[in-house]
Regions:
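PLP-dependent enzyme catalytic core of the Aspartate aminotransferase-like
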Residues: 2, 335, 339-420
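Active-site phosphate-binding strand-loop segment of PLP-dependent enzymes
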Residues: 116-176, 189
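A glycine-/small-polar-enriched, mobile loop at the entrance of the PLP active site in fold-type I
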Residues: 3-61, 65
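Conserved PLP-binding catalytic core of the aspartate aminotransferase-like
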Residues: 290-324
Length: 420
Protein backbone atom coordinates (compact mmCIF):
# COMPACT_ATOMS: atom_id res chain seq x y z
CA UNK A 1 0.00 0.00 0.00
CA UNK A 2 1.32 3.45 -0.89
CA UNK A 3 2.20 5.82 1.93
CA UNK A 4 3.13 4.91 5.46
CA UNK A 5 1.10 3.13 8.09
CA UNK A 6 -0.46 5.51 10.61
CA UNK A 7 0.03 3.96 14.03
CA UNK A 8 -2.60 4.88 16.61
CA UNK A 9 -2.51 1.96 19.02
CA UNK A 10 -1.70 2.83 22.65
CA UNK A 11 1.77 1.32 22.28
CA UNK A 12 4.03 0.74 20.58
CA UNK A 13 3.90 4.39 19.65
CA UNK A 14 5.43 6.45 16.87
CA UNK A 15 9.20 6.83 17.15
CA UNK A 16 10.58 10.34 16.54
CA UNK A 17 13.17 10.70 13.79
CA UNK A 18 15.71 11.89 16.34
CA UNK A 19 15.30 8.72 18.35
CA UNK A 20 15.52 6.47 15.30
CA UNK A 21 18.75 8.14 14.22
CA UNK A 22 20.17 7.79 17.72
CA UNK A 23 19.57 4.04 17.58
CA UNK A 24 21.40 3.65 14.27
CA UNK A 25 24.69 2.74 15.91
CA UNK A 26 27.24 0.04 15.41
CA UNK A 27 27.55 -2.46 18.23
CA UNK A 28 30.15 -1.97 20.93
CA UNK A 29 31.60 -3.75 23.93
CA UNK A 30 29.16 -3.27 26.79
CA UNK A 31 31.99 -4.04 29.23
CA UNK A 32 34.40 -1.46 27.85
CA UNK A 33 35.80 1.35 30.04
CA UNK A 34 33.74 3.85 28.02
CA UNK A 35 30.36 2.15 28.48
CA UNK A 36 29.43 3.62 31.91
CA UNK A 37 29.09 7.06 30.30
CA UNK A 38 25.88 5.83 28.69
CA UNK A 39 24.44 4.64 32.00
CA UNK A 40 25.30 7.97 33.63
CA UNK A 41 23.05 9.69 31.10
CA UNK A 42 20.10 7.34 31.49
CA UNK A 43 19.59 6.94 35.22
CA UNK A 44 19.41 10.65 36.18
CA UNK A 45 17.11 11.28 33.22
CA UNK A 46 14.73 8.55 34.32
CA UNK A 47 14.62 9.96 37.84
CA UNK A 48 13.39 13.24 36.37
CA UNK A 49 10.66 11.48 34.39
CA UNK A 50 9.51 9.59 37.50
CA UNK A 51 9.76 12.87 39.45
CA UNK A 52 11.83 11.31 42.19
CA UNK A 53 14.85 12.27 44.24
CA UNK A 54 14.82 9.19 46.45
CA UNK A 55 13.82 6.41 44.05
CA UNK A 56 16.28 4.20 42.19
CA UNK A 57 15.57 3.46 38.50
CA UNK A 58 16.40 0.17 36.81
CA UNK A 59 16.42 -0.75 33.12
CA UNK A 60 15.84 -4.37 32.09
CA UNK A 61 15.94 -5.92 28.61
CA UNK A 62 12.26 -6.88 28.81
CA UNK A 63 8.74 -5.59 28.41
CA UNK A 64 6.88 -3.77 31.15
CA UNK A 65 5.45 -7.16 32.14
CA UNK A 66 8.94 -8.25 33.13
CA UNK A 67 9.14 -5.34 35.52
CA UNK A 68 5.79 -6.33 37.04
CA UNK A 69 7.52 -9.56 37.98
CA UNK A 70 10.63 -7.73 39.20
CA UNK A 71 8.56 -5.46 41.45
CA UNK A 72 6.75 -8.36 43.09
CA UNK A 73 9.52 -10.95 43.41
CA UNK A 74 12.06 -8.56 44.91
CA UNK A 75 9.78 -7.45 47.73
CA UNK A 76 7.38 -10.26 48.67
CA UNK A 77 7.35 -13.86 49.87
CA UNK A 78 5.15 -16.87 49.01
CA UNK A 79 1.69 -16.54 50.55
CA UNK A 80 1.93 -12.78 51.13
CA UNK A 81 -1.37 -11.00 50.65
CA UNK A 82 -1.69 -8.20 48.11
CA UNK A 83 -4.69 -5.98 47.44
CA UNK A 84 -5.59 -5.40 43.80
CA UNK A 85 -8.52 -4.07 41.80
CA UNK A 86 -9.52 -5.64 38.48
CA UNK A 87 -11.16 -3.23 36.06
CA UNK A 88 -9.49 -4.01 32.72
CA UNK A 89 -7.27 -6.46 30.92
CA UNK A 90 -3.96 -5.19 32.25
CA UNK A 91 -5.03 -4.91 35.87
CA UNK A 92 -6.30 -8.48 35.40
CA UNK A 93 -2.96 -9.68 34.01
CA UNK A 94 -1.02 -8.28 36.95
CA UNK A 95 -3.39 -10.10 39.31
CA UNK A 96 -2.94 -13.27 37.28
CA UNK A 97 0.84 -13.01 37.54
CA UNK A 98 0.69 -12.52 41.31
CA UNK A 99 -1.53 -15.57 41.68
CA UNK A 100 0.71 -17.73 39.51
CA UNK A 101 3.85 -16.90 41.47
CA UNK A 102 2.26 -17.83 44.79
CA UNK A 103 0.77 -14.70 46.31
CA UNK A 104 -2.59 -14.43 48.07
CA UNK A 105 -4.43 -11.82 46.02
CA UNK A 106 -7.38 -10.02 47.59
CA UNK A 107 -9.26 -8.96 44.47
CA UNK A 108 -11.75 -6.11 44.20
CA UNK A 109 -13.69 -6.61 40.98
CA UNK A 110 -14.93 -3.38 39.43
CA UNK A 111 -16.98 -2.47 36.40
CA UNK A 112 -14.81 -2.09 33.32
CA UNK A 113 -14.77 1.61 32.49
CA UNK A 114 -14.07 2.59 36.09
CA UNK A 115 -10.75 2.68 37.92
CA UNK A 116 -9.22 2.00 41.31
CA UNK A 117 -12.07 2.04 43.89
CA UNK A 118 -10.63 4.41 46.47
CA UNK A 119 -13.35 4.03 49.10
CA UNK A 120 -13.22 0.23 48.96
CA UNK A 121 -9.45 0.34 49.21
CA UNK A 122 -9.73 2.67 52.20
CA UNK A 123 -12.27 0.43 53.95
CA UNK A 124 -10.22 -2.72 53.35
CA UNK A 125 -7.00 -1.13 54.57
CA UNK A 126 -8.64 0.25 57.72
CA UNK A 127 -10.11 -3.17 58.48
CA UNK A 128 -6.73 -4.86 58.04
CA UNK A 129 -5.54 -4.05 61.56
CA UNK A 130 -3.12 -6.99 61.57
CA UNK A 131 -1.46 -5.63 58.43
CA UNK A 132 -1.73 -8.90 56.55
CA UNK A 133 -1.77 -6.97 53.27
CA UNK A 134 1.85 -6.50 52.26
CA UNK A 135 1.35 -4.58 49.02
CA UNK A 136 -1.35 -2.59 47.23
CA UNK A 137 -1.46 -2.76 43.44
CA UNK A 138 -2.82 0.07 41.31
CA UNK A 139 -2.95 0.30 37.53
CA UNK A 140 -2.48 4.01 36.86
CA UNK A 141 -3.69 3.93 33.26
CA UNK A 142 -5.73 0.96 32.07
CA UNK A 143 -5.21 0.95 28.32
CA UNK A 144 -7.87 -1.68 27.62
CA UNK A 145 -10.65 0.70 28.66
CA UNK A 146 -9.03 4.15 28.48
CA UNK A 147 -9.21 4.76 32.23
CA UNK A 148 -6.82 6.67 34.48
CA UNK A 149 -6.94 6.15 38.26
CA UNK A 150 -6.09 8.47 41.13
CA UNK A 151 -2.84 7.19 42.62
CA UNK A 152 -2.58 10.02 45.13
CA UNK A 153 -5.93 8.82 46.48
CA UNK A 154 -4.51 5.34 47.01
CA UNK A 155 -1.64 6.83 48.99
CA UNK A 156 -4.15 8.81 51.08
CA UNK A 157 -6.05 5.60 51.84
CA UNK A 158 -2.84 3.93 53.03
CA UNK A 159 -1.83 6.91 55.14
CA UNK A 160 -5.26 7.37 56.72
CA UNK A 161 -5.27 3.71 57.73
CA UNK A 162 -1.66 4.03 58.96
CA UNK A 163 -0.99 0.96 56.87
CA UNK A 164 2.61 -0.04 56.05
CA UNK A 165 1.85 -1.91 52.83
CA UNK A 166 3.98 -1.16 49.80
CA UNK A 167 2.36 0.77 46.94
CA UNK A 168 2.97 -0.75 43.49
CA UNK A 169 1.90 1.24 40.43
CA UNK A 170 1.63 0.15 36.81
CA UNK A 171 2.70 3.26 34.91
CA UNK A 172 3.36 1.52 31.59
CA UNK A 173 1.04 3.75 29.55
CA UNK A 174 1.18 6.84 31.76
CA UNK A 175 4.85 7.58 32.47
CA UNK A 176 6.07 10.44 30.32
CA UNK A 177 2.53 11.29 29.17
CA UNK A 178 0.20 11.64 32.17
CA UNK A 179 1.26 13.35 35.40
CA UNK A 180 3.22 10.84 37.48
CA UNK A 181 4.77 11.75 40.85
CA UNK A 182 6.75 8.95 42.43
CA UNK A 183 7.87 10.83 45.54
CA UNK A 184 4.77 12.96 46.10
CA UNK A 185 2.49 9.92 45.89
CA UNK A 186 4.68 7.73 48.06
CA UNK A 187 5.05 5.06 45.38
CA UNK A 188 7.29 2.13 46.29
CA UNK A 189 7.53 0.34 42.96
CA UNK A 190 6.60 1.93 39.63
CA UNK A 191 6.65 -0.10 36.43
CA UNK A 192 6.87 1.17 32.87
CA UNK A 193 8.19 0.28 29.43
CA UNK A 194 10.02 1.86 26.53
CA UNK A 195 7.29 1.67 23.89
CA UNK A 196 4.80 4.21 25.24
CA UNK A 197 5.55 7.74 26.46
CA UNK A 198 9.29 7.15 26.16
CA UNK A 199 8.81 6.90 22.37
CA UNK A 200 11.01 3.85 21.76
CA UNK A 201 10.52 0.38 20.31
CA UNK A 202 9.40 -2.27 22.78
CA UNK A 203 12.22 -4.01 24.61
CA UNK A 204 13.09 -2.06 27.74
CA UNK A 205 11.36 -2.63 31.06
CA UNK A 206 11.67 0.41 33.31
CA UNK A 207 11.34 0.12 37.08
CA UNK A 208 11.72 2.64 39.90
CA UNK A 209 12.05 1.48 43.50
CA UNK A 210 11.79 3.40 46.77
CA UNK A 211 14.32 2.90 49.57
CA UNK A 212 11.61 1.05 51.51
CA UNK A 213 11.03 -1.33 48.60
CA UNK A 214 14.74 -1.93 48.11
CA UNK A 215 15.12 -2.82 51.76
CA UNK A 216 12.48 -5.53 51.33
CA UNK A 217 14.69 -7.45 48.89
CA UNK A 218 16.74 -8.72 51.84
CA UNK A 219 13.75 -10.59 53.29
CA UNK A 220 11.75 -11.38 50.13
CA UNK A 221 11.55 -15.13 49.53
CA UNK A 222 9.91 -15.34 46.10
CA UNK A 223 12.23 -16.99 43.60
CA UNK A 224 14.01 -14.66 41.23
CA UNK A 225 17.01 -14.85 38.95
CA UNK A 226 16.92 -12.72 35.79
CA UNK A 227 15.04 -9.95 37.62
CA UNK A 228 17.07 -10.03 40.84
CA UNK A 229 17.68 -6.42 41.84
CA UNK A 230 20.76 -7.41 43.81
CA UNK A 231 22.50 -8.25 40.55
CA UNK A 232 21.38 -4.99 38.98
CA UNK A 233 22.43 -2.90 41.96
CA UNK A 234 25.88 -4.43 42.07
CA UNK A 235 26.49 -3.99 38.35
CA UNK A 236 24.85 -0.57 38.00
CA UNK A 237 27.05 0.81 40.77
CA UNK A 238 29.95 0.84 38.31
CA UNK A 239 27.86 1.77 35.27
CA UNK A 240 27.43 -1.75 33.91
CA UNK A 241 24.70 -4.40 33.70
CA UNK A 242 24.72 -8.01 34.94
CA UNK A 243 23.99 -9.27 31.42
CA UNK A 244 23.91 -7.89 27.90
CA UNK A 245 21.82 -4.70 27.75
CA UNK A 246 19.73 -3.65 24.75
CA UNK A 247 22.37 -1.28 23.41
CA UNK A 248 20.52 0.32 20.51
CA UNK A 249 17.44 0.95 22.64
CA UNK A 250 19.55 2.53 25.34
CA UNK A 251 20.99 5.04 22.89
CA UNK A 252 17.45 5.77 21.81
CA UNK A 253 16.46 6.20 25.44
CA UNK A 254 19.15 8.83 25.94
CA UNK A 255 17.73 10.79 23.00
CA UNK A 256 14.12 10.44 24.14
CA UNK A 257 15.10 11.67 27.60
CA UNK A 258 16.70 14.71 25.95
CA UNK A 259 13.48 15.38 24.05
CA UNK A 260 11.43 15.09 27.23
CA UNK A 261 13.70 17.50 29.06
CA UNK A 262 13.63 19.99 26.18
CA UNK A 263 9.83 20.05 26.06
CA UNK A 264 9.42 19.83 29.83
CA UNK A 265 7.30 17.28 31.68
CA UNK A 266 4.61 19.78 32.61
CA UNK A 267 4.29 20.81 28.96
CA UNK A 268 4.16 17.17 27.88
CA UNK A 269 1.36 16.42 30.34
CA UNK A 270 -0.54 19.52 29.16
CA UNK A 271 -0.03 18.55 25.51
CA UNK A 272 -1.41 15.07 26.07
CA UNK A 273 -4.49 16.46 27.84
CA UNK A 274 -5.09 19.02 25.10
CA UNK A 275 -4.80 16.42 22.34
CA UNK A 276 -6.97 13.94 24.23
CA UNK A 277 -9.71 16.53 24.68
CA UNK A 278 -9.83 17.00 20.92
CA UNK A 279 -10.17 13.25 20.36
CA UNK A 280 -12.91 13.05 22.99
CA UNK A 281 -14.73 15.90 21.24
CA UNK A 282 -14.57 13.94 17.99
CA UNK A 283 -16.00 10.82 19.64
CA UNK A 284 -18.77 12.32 21.75
CA UNK A 285 -19.73 15.55 19.98
CA UNK A 286 -18.84 14.69 16.41
CA UNK A 287 -19.79 11.04 16.12
CA UNK A 288 -22.28 10.92 19.00
CA UNK A 289 -20.63 7.81 20.43
CA UNK A 290 -19.63 6.96 23.99
CA UNK A 291 -16.29 6.25 25.57
CA UNK A 292 -15.73 3.10 27.60
CA UNK A 293 -14.69 5.27 30.57
CA UNK A 294 -17.87 5.78 32.56
CA UNK A 295 -17.16 9.27 33.87
CA UNK A 296 -14.97 12.21 32.94
CA UNK A 297 -12.86 11.67 36.06
CA UNK A 298 -11.69 8.37 34.54
CA UNK A 299 -10.78 9.73 31.10
CA UNK A 300 -7.32 8.76 29.96
CA UNK A 301 -5.13 11.30 28.20
CA UNK A 302 -3.19 8.60 26.35
CA UNK A 303 -5.92 6.37 24.91
CA UNK A 304 -9.62 6.67 24.10
CA UNK A 305 -11.71 3.49 23.92
CA UNK A 306 -14.65 4.16 21.59
CA UNK A 307 -17.80 2.10 22.19
CA UNK A 308 -19.60 0.94 19.05
CA UNK A 309 -23.34 0.47 18.43
CA UNK A 310 -24.92 -2.91 19.10
CA UNK A 311 -24.50 -5.30 16.20
CA UNK A 312 -21.21 -3.80 15.03
CA UNK A 313 -18.04 -5.82 15.53
CA UNK A 314 -15.12 -3.61 16.45
CA UNK A 315 -12.76 -6.05 14.77
CA UNK A 316 -14.41 -5.23 11.42
CA UNK A 317 -13.83 -1.51 11.90
CA UNK A 318 -10.21 -2.10 12.86
CA UNK A 319 -9.63 -4.40 9.89
CA UNK A 320 -11.25 -1.93 7.49
CA UNK A 321 -9.16 0.96 8.82
CA UNK A 322 -5.98 -1.07 8.39
CA UNK A 323 -6.67 -2.78 5.06
CA UNK A 324 -8.29 0.15 3.26
CA UNK A 325 -6.78 3.25 4.87
CA UNK A 326 -3.50 1.98 6.36
CA UNK A 327 -4.49 3.20 9.83
CA UNK A 328 -3.75 1.01 12.87
CA UNK A 329 -6.33 1.27 15.66
CA UNK A 330 -6.29 -0.63 18.94
CA UNK A 331 -8.56 -3.63 19.43
CA UNK A 332 -10.94 -4.35 22.28
CA UNK A 333 -9.51 -6.87 24.74
CA UNK A 334 -11.12 -9.63 26.79
CA UNK A 335 -14.52 -8.47 28.12
CA UNK A 336 -14.72 -5.61 25.62
CA UNK A 337 -13.41 -7.53 22.60
CA UNK A 338 -15.47 -6.63 19.54
CA UNK A 339 -17.33 -3.89 21.41
CA UNK A 340 -14.93 -1.02 20.82
CA UNK A 341 -11.82 0.23 19.13
CA UNK A 342 -9.09 2.32 20.71
CA UNK A 343 -7.27 5.43 19.53
CA UNK A 344 -3.87 5.87 21.10
CA UNK A 345 -2.80 9.50 21.47
CA UNK A 346 0.50 9.40 23.31
CA UNK A 347 4.13 10.06 22.62
CA UNK A 348 5.33 12.08 19.64
CA UNK A 349 1.96 13.39 18.53
CA UNK A 350 0.23 16.60 17.39
CA UNK A 351 -3.17 17.74 16.11
CA UNK A 352 -2.63 16.83 12.46
CA UNK A 353 -1.35 13.38 13.39
CA UNK A 354 -4.60 12.79 15.22
CA UNK A 355 -6.71 14.18 12.39
CA UNK A 356 -5.46 11.18 10.41
CA UNK A 357 -6.61 8.81 13.16
CA UNK A 358 -10.00 10.46 13.42
CA UNK A 359 -10.63 10.60 9.66
CA UNK A 360 -9.38 7.04 9.13
CA UNK A 361 -11.58 5.70 11.93
CA UNK A 362 -14.53 7.70 10.64
CA UNK A 363 -14.24 6.35 7.08
CA UNK A 364 -13.87 2.81 8.41
CA UNK A 365 -16.98 3.20 10.56
CA UNK A 366 -18.98 4.52 7.62
CA UNK A 367 -17.79 1.61 5.48
CA UNK A 368 -18.98 -0.78 8.21
CA UNK A 369 -22.46 0.73 8.30
CA UNK A 370 -22.16 2.96 11.36
CA UNK A 371 -24.25 6.09 10.94
CA UNK A 372 -21.95 8.98 11.63
CA UNK A 373 -21.93 12.24 9.70
CA UNK A 374 -18.97 12.38 7.31
CA UNK A 375 -16.43 14.92 8.54
CA UNK A 376 -18.09 15.31 11.94
CA UNK A 377 -15.20 13.89 13.95
CA UNK A 378 -12.48 16.03 12.43
CA UNK A 379 -14.75 19.08 12.63
CA UNK A 380 -15.37 18.60 16.35
CA UNK A 381 -11.72 17.95 17.11
CA UNK A 382 -10.63 20.91 15.02
CA UNK A 383 -13.09 23.20 16.75
CA UNK A 384 -11.68 22.21 20.12
CA UNK A 385 -8.05 22.60 19.11
CA UNK A 386 -8.60 25.89 17.25
CA UNK A 387 -10.32 27.50 20.21
CA UNK A 388 -8.00 26.32 22.95
CA UNK A 389 -4.43 27.43 23.44
CA UNK A 390 -1.89 24.85 22.35
CA UNK A 391 0.65 23.90 25.02
CA UNK A 392 4.18 25.09 24.34
CA UNK A 393 5.15 21.54 23.41
CA UNK A 394 3.18 22.00 20.17
CA UNK A 395 5.05 25.12 19.13
CA UNK A 396 7.07 24.35 16.02
CA UNK A 397 10.43 23.02 17.02
CA UNK A 398 13.42 21.48 15.28
CA UNK A 399 12.44 17.83 15.17
CA UNK A 400 15.60 17.03 13.24
CA UNK A 401 17.82 18.20 16.06
CA UNK A 402 20.37 15.68 17.23
CA UNK A 403 22.16 15.81 20.55
CA UNK A 404 25.80 16.77 20.19
CA UNK A 405 27.02 16.78 23.76
CA UNK A 406 29.60 14.20 24.69
CA UNK A 407 30.77 12.68 27.92
CA UNK A 408 34.09 10.91 27.81
CA UNK A 409 34.30 9.06 24.52
CA UNK A 410 30.53 8.67 24.16
CA UNK A 411 28.28 10.84 22.07
CA UNK A 412 24.80 11.02 23.57
CA UNK A 413 23.45 9.91 20.20
CA UNK A 414 25.71 6.91 19.73
CA UNK A 415 29.16 5.49 20.20
CA UNK A 416 32.15 7.60 19.31
CA UNK A 417 33.29 7.17 15.74
CA UNK A 418 36.99 6.48 15.54
CA UNK A 419 38.58 7.55 12.30
CA UNK A 420 41.80 5.92 11.23
Amino acid sequence: MAGRNFLFVPGPTNIPDRVMRAMMVSMEDHRSPAFPALTREIMPGLKKVFRTEHGTPFVFPSSGTGCWEAAVTNTLSPGDRVLAARFGQFSHLWIDMCTRIGLDVQIVDCEWGTGVPLQQYADILKADTEHRIKAVLACHNETATGVTSDISGVREALDEAKHPALLFVDGVSSLGSIDFRFDDWGVDMAVSGSQKGLMLPAGLGILCASPKALEMRHSAQLKRAYFDLNDMINANATGYFPYTPALSLMYGLVESLHMIEEEGLDNIVARHHYLAEGVRAAVTKGWGLKLCAKEAKWYSDTVSAVMLPEGINGADVIARAFNRYNVSLGAGLSKVAGKLFRIGHLGDMNEVHLMAAISGAEMAMLDCGIKVTPGSGTAAAGEYWRHHSAPSGLIVRDTHKHSKETHGTHSLSGPAVVKG
